[in-house]
Curated annotation (Swiss-Prot):
InterPro entries: Ribosomal_eL29. GO terms for cellular component: cytosolic large ribosomal subunit. Keywords: Ribonucleoprotein, Ribosomal protein. Coiled coil: none annotated. Residues 1-33 are annotated as: Disordered. The keyword Ribonucleoprotein applies. Belongs to the eukaryotic ribosomal protein eL29 family. The gene is rpl29. The keyword Ribosomal protein applies. Residues 1-31 have a biased composition (Basic residues). GO terms for biological process: cytoplasmic translation. It holds the Pfam family Ribosomal_L29e. GO terms for molecular function: structural constituent of ribosome. This is Large ribosomal subunit protein eL29.
């Protein structure tokens, strides 16, 4: 006699949720594998200058530099040494 039951969803839901049901990964750039070389080259040239400008506070503005840009390590060390020397000088008085 042939087997009648071929599929069951028993315990499947628990197993599926054990590691969480995740969204499918959306890749930013599709593969250009197998694309004609001339077409791919033209696409690369066409893409130049089409970068999306950043939208800041209601209109298109230039992105401003940070108020406190990151300092080089030498500058930080020199400032710390100067601060320590000032503390020692104040303690001697």
């Amino acid at each position: 006699m042939a087997k009648s039951k071929n599929h069951s969803t028993h315990h499947k839901n628990r197993k599926d949720h054990r590691n969480g049901i995740k969204k499918a990964v959306v890749h930013k750039k599709t593969s250009s594998k197998g694309v004609e070389l001339g077409f791919a080259r033209n696409q690369r040239y066409a893409r130049i200058g089409t970068e999306i400008k950043r939208y800041v506070r209601g209109d298109m503005q230039e992105v401003k530099a940070h108020k406190n840009p990151r300092q080089p390590l030498k500058t930080i060390v020199a400032a710390a040494k100067a601060k320590l020397a000032a503390k020692k000088a104040a303690a001697k008085k």
